[in-house]
């Protein structure tokens, strides 16, 4: 469950290390975002010479949450931290060319096939 002011790790090679959620997109007064939801983020920590820089405001898709995601069979997949993949503001395609760490199968339903294909492991 990601809400405003939540700090997330970045699971791609866009150059950002830590980001903060500033808005959960999808409906007015929506409070929480889960895996597969798009959020508006600002870069809080970035590496030198990356594709993004500190202070940039972009969109991102949540790929891992500590809260986890419940499957129809009753199982829950949880992670050690919250992570997102930074998206281009216009095309909503990933900015980075590599994804680090596992992602969940729920992204397939949310039309993020590019992230699924780049990920090293899909749970």
UniProtKB/Swiss-Prot annotation:
GO cellular component, as recorded: cytosolic large ribosomal subunit
Entry keyword set: Ribonucleoprotein, Ribosomal protein, RNA-binding, rRNA-binding
Pfam families on file: Ribosomal_L14
Signal sequence interval, chain numbering: none
Gene Ontology BP annotations: translation
SMART domains the UniProt entry points to: Ribosomal_L14
Cysteine disulfide links: none
InterPro entries membership: Ribosomal_uL14, Ribosomal_uL14_bac-type, Ribosomal_uL14_CS, Ribosomal_uL14_sf
Quaternary data: Part of the 50S ribosomal subunit. Forms a cluster with proteins L3 and L19. In the 70S ribosome, L14 and L19 interact and together make contacts with the 16S rRNA in bridges B5 and B8.
NCBIfam families, per the entry: rplN_bact
Function description: Binds to 23S rRNA. Forms part of two intersubunit bridges in the 70S ribosome.
Protein's recorded name: Large ribosomal subunit protein uL14
Organism encoding this protein: Buchnera aphidicola subsp. Acyrthosiphon kondoi
């Amino acid at each position: 469950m990601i809400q405003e002011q939540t700090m997330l790790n970045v699971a791609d090679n866009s150059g950002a290390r830590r980001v903060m959620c500033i808005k959960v997109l999808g409906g007015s007064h929506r409070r929480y975002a889960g895996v597969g939801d798009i959020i508006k983020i600002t870069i809080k920590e970035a590496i030198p010479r990356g594709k993004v820089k500190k202070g940039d405001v972009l969109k991102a898709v949540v790929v891992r949450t500590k809260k986890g995601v419940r499957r129809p069979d009753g199982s829950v997949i949880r992670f050690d931290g919250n992570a997102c993949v930074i998206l281009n503001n216009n095309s909503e395609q990933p900015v980075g060319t590599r994804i680090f760490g596992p992602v969940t199968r729920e992204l397939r339903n949310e039309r993020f096939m590019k992230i699924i294909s780049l990920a090293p492991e899909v749970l």
